[in-house]
Amino acid sequence: MDTTTMPNLLWHKPGVAIDASIQTFLAADDVLLDREFFLYDITASTAHAQALQRIGLLTPDELDNILRELQHLSDEYRNGTFLLDTQYEDGHSAIESRLTERLGDTGRKIHTGRSRNDQILVATRLWLKDRLTQLSTLNRDIAHHALQRAAAEQHLPMPGYTHLQRAVVSSAGMWWAGWAESFIDNALRAADTLALIDCNPLGTAAGYGVNLPLDRPHTTTALGFARLQVNPICAQLSRGKFELAALEALGSATLDLRRIAWDLSLFTTSEFAFITLPPEYSTGSSIMPNKRNPDVIELMRATHASVAAARTEIEQLLSLPSGYHRDLQNSKGAIVRGFNRGLAALELLPALLSRLQWRPDTLRAAIDPGMYATDAAIEAAIAGIPFRDAYQMAAKTADTAAQDRTPETSLTARRSPGAAADLCLETLRARWHTLTQPTSDPDPR
């Protein structure tokens, strides 16, 4: 058995051998993932040290020394002087190791009353708050661009499709307004999820509290949480569950991203030729000189698969009884991969939406006579013919339904709220304006 092992194992007992291969398996890439959470962990350690001083477990001088060293560690991590690597089991170990190295016994006091369990809970919670804030902002931005395009192009006719078959006359404005409302909903969902997870787990330790009068309300305020997560068992049950909720909010946005990317992929084909993409959103072929491929849109479309995979991984991890289990370590990789990929794709969408160009002549040419048949059936019903009879009449004359009709007259006639003649843009703008920017502490990076 190879007993060579990493130093700085917080849980190691003297005289107990550790198999290096087992330790490598246990740690996996955990410390590398902790680079995402490290500054949040330092922030939480600052609040915890203050809480310890408030109950007399640290002197004022000890607190000052700890806060100074935590700030130094944060600065060194930001500027690259301190590298969080595999000499440490995880980010928590790195923080305690640094404090002990610099402050001796004072540094060894930092872990009083806390566990790595509530450490990662609070660091992840702070990280998720910032990611959900970013998600909500991106959803608002996407909706904003879509609303602008809806207003500008509400009178531009285009085919409306069902089953990928031409159905009725629609408008570019209606297409845009549909995405605007969808991303307003996505912004609300992100904000609601942020409100759900905005609670402080620090001080719940390993899931059963500690025999100390920890000032948890103080750390709640210091860390910018809206409320305390009261029960330690509930705090442990929330690990994975809150990450899952956050990924579901992200997935709501990337699901719409996938569908709008699908539309754009179709509309850029020679067979449709409805839109022209900015050149930087396409690539070429390594063998076919004539090709311009919408690779950016295709990878946007694929993004939802990454988010869904992360969500599925966490769902499977949560087949556990109550309390902490090491399985949950794997939830970190899932949320990091899901959010990093999802947000990166969503960040590209506002500029794309503002710059793509419709081709009005092709849109109009794709509107065929049969697309007026529904209008004809409803007009006959208005004249007193039972709708089912009017439907049959219109079906027989669908090929000639365009007589005395234009795309513009069809659009003007569609007056039901939300339809082409009444997009209700003011209603959507009012909803958009209710999307207050979610509050979160600034990203420490």
From Swiss-Prot:
It comes from Xylella fastidiosa (strain Temecula1 / ATCC 700964). This is Argininosuccinate lyase. It catalyses: 2-(N(omega)-L-arginino)succinate = fumarate + L-arginine. Transmembrane segments: none annotated. Disulfide bonds: none annotated. The keyword Amino-acid biosynthesis applies. The gene is argH. Pfam families: Lyase_1. It is found in: Cytoplasm.
